[in-house]
Amino acid sequence: MNTSHLINCRLVPAASALLFLIACSAEKNETPVPSFNGDRAFSYIEKQVSFGPRVPGSDNSVNCQKYLIDFFDSLDATVDTMQFVHVDKITGKPITMVNIIASFTGYDEDNDEKYILAAHYDSRPRAEYDPDSTKRNNWIDGADDGASGVAVLMELGNLLASQRARVDIDMLLLDGEDYGRPGDLDEYFLGAKDFVLRDVKDKYKFALVIDMIGDKDLRIYREEHSNKYSPEFTDRVWKIAAELGETAFVDSVKHAIYDDHLSFMTIKLPAAVIIDFDYRYWHTTHDTPDKCSPESLASVGRVVATLLYRL
């Protein structure tokens, strides 16, 4: 992902206040939210990184794909893959990439709402910000930038398998998000760009992207595009974070970020991203599991889990 420089409560009469309180209570699902296990989520980061850098088209990527498919299969999710070929602009080499979709059906048989939770599982084929200039063409592990978002989705999958939400949830594991070269957006977000071409707009109400949320020093600000184009849903996320006392979520806008959520916006599907863009090890060979923490994963996981079980 890249960054750009683009872009109350009030007093009411007693009767209205009572209705307000009832409405607020009704918004919350009475079913308790299952406990998000940050330690288990962290182990999923370690497992993904153990395959080596998950650069699109590599054996490492294929092995990680199999692991993720088997994982969600074991939860009895409906798992599908979407394969596409990207031709590298510079080398002309065709690269096969694969998106993975794990679908969890809600318990409400009358429900026709479906939501996307998305994260990219690929890691970057270059480390242009590495302090060691001799390593800037190295592939990176992508523990935070890649594996952390997927790890949160995996643990949320455990929760949904043990206790269904009311609505249908599709977990979308995207390939090719971070393939591009600096300064050229054409070869970023390749999995998301392919996905939105597949007549998906009317199938979903909202897409929430989770990216770079494993940092030990976690600080998540509202992202500018999300806040501008999907304010209602963004407000809902930060309201839940405040309610839960998750202080890593900062209630102000800081960055305008190019990430997978913008691809959903191109088809007018409301979307937002949860991301900590102040990660010191971004696009370096130092983006390794020791820079991440179970506590950070759990903070994000609790917020998103609460959101899911209130939809």
Protein language model features and the residues they cover:
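N-terminal capping segment at the start of a domain
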Residues: 25-65, 75, 280-288
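A non-catalytic alpha/beta surface segment that caps or lines the substrate-entry region
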Residues: 32, 53-107
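Acidic/histidine-rich catalytic neighborhood of metal-dependent amide-processing enzymes
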Residues: 137-232, 261
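C-terminal motif of bacterial Sec signal peptides marking the signal peptidase cleavage site
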Residues: 21-23
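Catalytic-core environment of secreted peptidases
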Residues: 38-51, 75, 94, 98-161, ...
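Second-shell loop/turn segments in exported
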Residues: 30-35, 50-59, 87-91, 135-146, ...
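Active-site-adjacent substrate-binding region
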Residues: 85-87, 215-311
